[in-house]
UniProtKB/Swiss-Prot annotation:
Enzymatic reactions: (2R,3S)-homoisocitrate = cis-homoaconitate + H2O
Any Pfam family the entry gives: Aconitase
Protein name, as recorded: Homoaconitase large subunit
EC id: 4.2.1.36
Subunit text: Heterodimer of HacA and HacB.
Cofactor(s) needed by this chain: [4Fe-4S] cluster
Activation/inhibition comment: Is not inhibited by lysine.
Top-level enzyme category: lyase
Molecular function terms, GO-annotated: 3-isopropylmalate dehydratase activity; 4 iron, 4 sulfur cluster binding; homoaconitate hydratase activity; metal ion binding
PANTHER family named in the record: 3-ISOPROPYLMALATE DEHYDRATASE LARGE SUBUNIT 1, HOMOACONITASE, MITOCHONDRIAL-RELATED
Source organism of this protein record: Thermus thermophilus (strain ATCC BAA-163 / DSM 7039 / HB27)
UniProt-listed NCBIfam families: hacA_fam, IPMI_arch, PRK00402.1
Gene name linked to the record: hacA
Similarity comment: Belongs to the aconitase/IPM isomerase family.
Top-rank lineage group of the source organism: Bacteria
Length: 418
């Protein structure tokens, strides 16, 4: 019986063939710690009377509340900088960007690696063929102290995307459709193994990041995109880093990209996904474009394309937060930033922004937000009764202009008949 991609990677780390269900101890190639967990991480290491065994394999990213929103956070971030300097640990400071975007830009996630992070969306690293998974402060501290971690080899779900995306449809729409089909608990502690076939292999690294990012919303332990397309040009992909044809899967799902339409996830569950056409017209107070899901340069360009020559509705706050300083620089160079500003957008410091509801756009009671992020749970961005609709940058931009949930195509049609 052949092996899945998850089994291949973990077998390579263990040094022998492993199967789903086995408990294994594996070498960790990179440990990622975010600012909001750093304090707990330090305390766990202190309790263990340990320091990072391989300092070069540990990165701390100040992104969740950046810049500091209050004195308490400012003190915590000061401690991060001092601790990093004291132990020779790499610290990506305020403004560098969202942890997952930064690690991939910096080459700190590579095909075949095991990357553990103190953020649930560490599945994003699977876009480049790495086994990325999120863990709590204790497990992260143990991984940093020992250079290893333990886990149960996950079963795998095979998700096959075929064809090419139609005009106006994005990888975010494909990712939301995937979560709808798998359901919120349909891949609990499984590796979602994504195959791109019959034209789908043309998806960019950024688009693959969106797919891998959202696998955790189906409960996934890891989200692994089988290397193809531009990944083969950008990285040195080992010959062994492919699933076997006779690998065994817990379930299989197939999605025809060419048949997709714009999607939206409706409060308060990510898998509550509908066609935008079914729920359009909902009045919007805030639109947020950014995060580790959709804050890359292609996302900002897609939004700018919709916003060019238009203005944001008077009652809408449009917040755009680039996923990294590199993205911000590219947007400034090619005119994307100017287009966003001319439309009425407010540009935030590269990082997580208002995604988790701690600063930079907290929602008031009863407010509605269209967001390109990955979670719309009750209270996620502020008030418990505030509503978050998850959508693509194109749908988010069109909704900002219209003042209600809509698509660029619907917006254009209404403008023609106005």
């Amino acid at each position: 019986m052949g092996q899945t991609l998850a089994e291949k990677i973990l077998s390579h780390k263990v040094g022998r063939p492993v199967r789903a269900g086995e408990l294994v101890v594996v070498e960790v190639d990179q440990v990622m710690v975010v600012d909001s967990i750093a304090g707990s991480f330090f305390k766990r290491l202190e309790y263990l009377e340990a320091t990072p065994r391989y300092p070069e394999r540990v990165s701390i990213v100040i992104d969740h509340v950046a810049p500091a929103a209050n004195l308490e956070v400012a003190k915590a971030q000061k401690e991060i900088r001092e601790w990093g300097k004291r132990h020779g640990i790499r610290v990506f400071d305020v403004g560098r960007g969202v942890c997952h975007q930064v690690l991939i830009e910096e080459g700190l996630a590579q095909p075949g690696w095991v990357v553990v992070g103190s953020d649930s969306h560490s599945t994003t690293y699977g876009a480049v063929g790495a086994f990325g998974t999120g863990m709590g402060a204790t497990d992260i501290a143990l991984a940093a102290a020992s250079g290893r971690t333990w886990l149960r080899v996950p079963e795998s779900v095979k998700v096959v995307f075929r064809g090419r995306l139609p005009k106006g449809v994005t990888a975010k729409d494909a990712a939301l459709e995937m979560v709808r089909l798998l359901t919120a608990e349909g891949a609990t502690y499984m590796a979602v193994e994504i195959h791109l076939l019959d034209g789908a292999e043309a998806l960019t690294r950024g688009e693959r990041m969106t797919l891998a990012n959202l696998t955790v919303e189906a409960g996934a332990k890891a989200g692994l995109v089988v290397p193809s397309g531009e990944i083969l040009e950008m990285y040195r992909v080992p010959d062994w880093l492919y699933p076997d044809p006779d690998a065994r899967y817990a379930k299989e799902v197939e999605i025809d990209l060419s048949a997709l339409t714009p999607r939206v996830s409706v409060p308060f569950y990510v898998d509550n996904v509908h066609e935008v056409a079914q729920v359009k017209g909902k009045r919007v107070d805030q639109v947020f474009i950014g995060t580790c899901t959709n804050g890359r340069i292609e996302d900002l360009r897609a939004a700018a394309e919709v916003l060019r020559g238009r203005k944001v509705a008077p009652w809408v706050r449009l917040l755009v937060v680039p996923a990294s300083s590199q993205v911000l620089e590219e947007a400034a160079r090619d005119g994307t930033l100017l287009t966003l500003l001319e439309a009425g957008a407010t540009i935030g410091t590269p990082g997580c922004g208002p995604c988790m509801g701690r600063h930079m756009g907290v929602l008031a009671p009863g407010e509605v937000c269209v967001s390109t992020s990955n979670r719309n749970f009750r209270g996620r961005m502020g008030a418990p009764d505030a509503e978050i609709y998850l959508a693509s940058p194109r749908v988010a931009a069109a909704s900002a202009v219209a003042g209600y949930l809509t698509t660029p195509e619907e917006l254009e049609e209404e403008e023609v008949h106005a």
